[in-house]
Amino acid sequence: AMAMQGSCISNVDVGSATVKLADDGSFNLIIGAADMGTGCDTILAQMVAECMDCSVDDVAVFGADTDASPYDSGSYASSTTYITGKAVEMACAKLKTQLCGIAAGMLGCSTEEVVFENGRVKQINTEKSVSLAEISVKDQVNNDIAAVATASHSSPVSPPPYMVGMVEIELDKDTGEVKILDYVAVVDCGITINPALARIQTEGGIVQGIGHTLFENITYDRNGRPIESSFLQYKVPTRLDMGHLRVEFENSYE
């Protein structure tokens, strides 16, 4: 079987992010999306780390607080990766420009003469450079350039991830019992940012779909009361019911 689920709602969803240089030269990422198991905290921290030439350990993520966080349409499907992820990239680009402005003043040169490289701001054609920690200190004394940037993003398109699923079952024709022996899924979801998280997300979706098809059902008695009133009667699949489960990714550019 083949299925497709969009990455977001085009021309509707909005993702926002704030990236701030902390006192010790690390970064704070403030987002409006809540990590409900989508893995967005980890994935967006990875994006900051790549954009700012630092370790993921140097990025502290602060999740949704509607009183303080920048606006986000919410977490579902791949929206936080595709929409909020772009907002993170844009915020990092803004922050780099601002850090270069602060560093240029410290180095006594123009912003055109500096470059952000390997977590430092260097003066071109010289050995002079300043660290992020040094920039952070300068940011707090006699400075009019903020070491924080916010960006929002909305997309006119929604990339269509595809999945193909193939399953081998064992069927008892007398009782109707179905056993899952082997399930193989091949997923094209663009560029996989975090394969481990994407794999378990896919496995969870597969198990949920199998549960809806083969296990879960609600019936009612003659008085209209549900018979499956607890998990003692309402059967949900576990990993032991799944047999061999395999997930492979086919990367493509969105």
Spans of model-derived segments:
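Conserved beta-alpha junction segments in alpha/beta enzyme cores
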Residues: 1-23, 31-33, 38
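C-terminal catalytic domains of large/alpha subunits in multi-subunit enzymes
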Residues: 1-7, 46-254
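A broad, low-specificity signal marking well-ordered, structured residues that form hydrophobic/aromatic
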Residues: 17, 27, 245
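Residue-level signal for tight coil/turn positions that link beta-strands
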Residues: 23-24, 118
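A short alpha-helix capping/helix-coil boundary motif
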Residues: 24-27, 79-80
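Short, aliphatic-rich beta-strand segments
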Residues: 26-31, 180-182
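Residue-level recognition of alpha-helix initiation/capping sites
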Residues: 39-40, 94
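Flexible, small-/acidic-enriched active-site or ligand-binding loops
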Residues: 43
